[in-house]
Amino acid sequence: MLTSAIKKQIRSSFEAAKIQLPNFSNRSSQNIMIAEISKTLSGEYPKSNPILCVEAPTGIGKTMAYLISCLPIAKANKKKLIIACANVALQEQILYKDIVEAKKYSSVEFEYALAKGRSRYVCIRNLINLTEETSNTQTLFEDALLWDEPPSQNQINKLSEMTDNYSSTRWSGEIDDLESPPEFSLWQKVACNRFTCTAKNCEFYNDCSFFKARKKASQADVIIANHDLVLADIINGNNILPDVNDCIFVFDEAHHFAQKALAHFSINASTEFMKTSIRQSQSAIDQISKITNQKTSESHIKKVDEAIGELIEVITNFEYLDDVYLFDMSGVSSDVANLGKNLLSIFNTAFGNFLDQKDNWQDYCKRNTVKQIIMDNLNNIIGQNDQNLSSIVSLLNAFTQNTHTDTPPTSNWIVKSKLPNKKINYHLNTAKIDVSNHLQSLIWSKAAGVIFTSATLTSLGSFDRMNQQLGLKEKENRYLRLASPFNYKSVDFIVANIKASPSEVFEHTQELARELKKRINKEAATLVLFASNSQMQMVADLVEKTIECELLVQGEYSKKRILEKHFEKRKNGEGSVIFGLDSFAEGVDLKGDNLNHV
């Protein structure tokens, strides 16, 4: 029920926002959004679920609308408010600007925290182990997962830099807080993951950036997350976020949510990954046997190689379109299914043997004293292998499964890629094409409230497509389309007269660079958005030395640092150019003289 006390808090927050926020503009569409969110979440529509879909065009002030309306209701009902964004840019916009402003004008006292997946945080144990000089105890692991090949000097320097910065508290342990993040392959070796994490059994538990962040999130009233984290956490049993029924969810940029959900119900693994994984798991088993003085279990490397060879003999003859072969909706062909089941049987046996050895190792550690560095490194290797073998078994299980007529079919396909040694790698993929029932049972039927909002939720003016993808029923929920505050009819849309087609990569890139050199004002603020990362890098190389002002390229710095540098340049009256991918613009607030040209 929308009580008089809650109404008063909402009105008080709105009036305070008018005073506290510079350049505040009263928009009727924002007022309607606040009212409808409040009514929906408070049960003012008894025949509807507490679910509202709001299409709110750019400029309405969506974030303020859902903060003003959701906060008092969440607090009054002792629920957590989960704000889930589609990308890091919007997440940081809310964290560093919108939520800070809300603390000033909100009539409700609240604490907030940022929640990210484990992989965004460093594992300090792994970082220290990799940074330390190689000792006799570490030679045992030379051929294991910690290093696929000897590290370069740059990698060693980067590890030392991260260790020093973390030890001196100059770095929080989040990859997004690094001014210059390490390459992905290096970060993977030091990032947290649930398979290698020993939680409270780790000597660095009290200093762990991930568990510090999780503790802060557990104490917060508002948790800022992203779509991927919410989906992963709910699917895996709420390890980071509160129980679904204790939460009110706001999915911002919700037009991305259906695609994100599909991705979380898809699996893939390549033939080369399978070969590498079986070898690495056997290496781990051999290391366990050597330390525990037990007989090593049977190797399955030869059987896996032979089974994969037989599978490749069949799939190499398929007719691929742009290196992709798509099976029909009845599932994979019988010959591929039989070969896949044979491979699955081998991996099931190998995985079972591996888990037995894992148990033996854990029992051995309980009964014997093992050097900490040996235990840490081997636990890390075991965790990685556990994850790899588990994912392969899941993939083969789903890939070879018979299609049932009473359930939505799955999509199965193979993608070819060429390795540096010119060898062909085959990626097996399987994905559900309809996850609406899963979303309904996991989230919509349990949540205390759900708000979907974006500038683009409808297709041809209808919410039907969104309802179909997310498993929502129009008669059971609330829907709202708001008018734009901008007069788009007065705006011209101009397409540059670029002669080269985008398919002519070299010519198009050269012409694009020439046009940008002509168009970029060295004294102004410019944002250039690309659909291709590789083209963005090439154009940056071509224009960097001639534009005579700061060029900030996405990927070279964190988004937060790029914006800080950009604002600093503009404050000093200097020109600044940002090169980013298309998603960079979502959630980035560049007002006034901070953006002159897109």
Predicted regions, residues:
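Walker A/P-loop
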Residues: 46-68
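A substrate-engagement module of RecA-like helicase motors
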Residues: 2-18, 25, 47, 58, ...
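A short beta-strand element within the Helicase C-terminal
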Residues: 590-598
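Signature of the SF2 helicase/ATPase Hel1-core->accessory helical subdomain module
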Residues: 66, 72, 89-92, 96-100, ...
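Conserved helicase motor "Helicase C" RecA-like lobe of SF1/SF2 P-loop NTPases
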Residues: 531-555
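Walker A/P-loop NTP-binding motif
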Residues: 38-42, 63-77, 97-101
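Conserved interdomain hinge at the start of the Helicase C-terminal
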Residues: 498-531
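A contiguous, basic/glycine-rich beta-loop/short-helix subdomain that forms a polymer-engagement track
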Residues: 188-218, 234-240, 361-492, 496-499, ...
